[in-house]
Amino acid sequence: MALGGRSFRSKKQQLAYDRSFAGRYQKLLSKNPFIFFGLPFCGMMVLGSYWLAGISQVKFDRDDQKVQEMNEEEILKMKHGKREFDIKEEYYRLQGLAEEDWEPKRVERFKGESDNVF
């Protein structure tokens, strides 16, 4: 493109554009890019950071409400109702549970499929 991607404007159109907000901003932006682009961008990043910090703090406060410190009475109640733990007893108890839940059963085969019985 000969105009570098810009559209051609007549003199009247260019004067009207220069008087518009976009034209004045573009002129100021070309003179001082940091003041008119960089500074607002950095400001938005800082303000966004503070805004998002407030939103995420609500999440952390809600999670902290779920976790509460226990008093002595609650600790004693937990210790009193607890049964003794023996690793061997738990092992044998879990071994017995596994035997009750299943029974051997052959999977039905499709017609013409071998039974793989040797």
Swiss-Prot record:
Keywords: Membrane, Mitochondrion, Mitochondrion inner membrane, Transit peptide, Transmembrane, Transmembrane helix. This is Cytochrome c oxidase assembly protein COX16, mitochondrial. It is a single-pass membrane protein. Belongs to the COX16 family. The keyword Repeat does not apply. It comes from Candida glabrata (strain ATCC 2001 / BCRC 20586 / JCM 3761 / NBRC 0622 / NRRL Y-65 / CBS 138) (Yeast). GO terms for biological process: mitochondrial cytochrome c oxidase assembly. The lineage of its organism: Eukaryota, Fungi, Dikarya, Ascomycota, Saccharomycotina. PANTHER family: CYTOCHROME C OXIDASE ASSEMBLY PROTEIN COX16 HOMOLOG, MITOCHONDRIAL, MITOCHONDRIAL OUTER MEMBRANE PROTEIN 25. Residues 1-28 form a transit peptide. One of its GO terms (cellular component) is mitochondrial inner membrane. InterPro entries: Cyt_c_Oxase_assmbl_COX16. It comes from the Eukaryota.
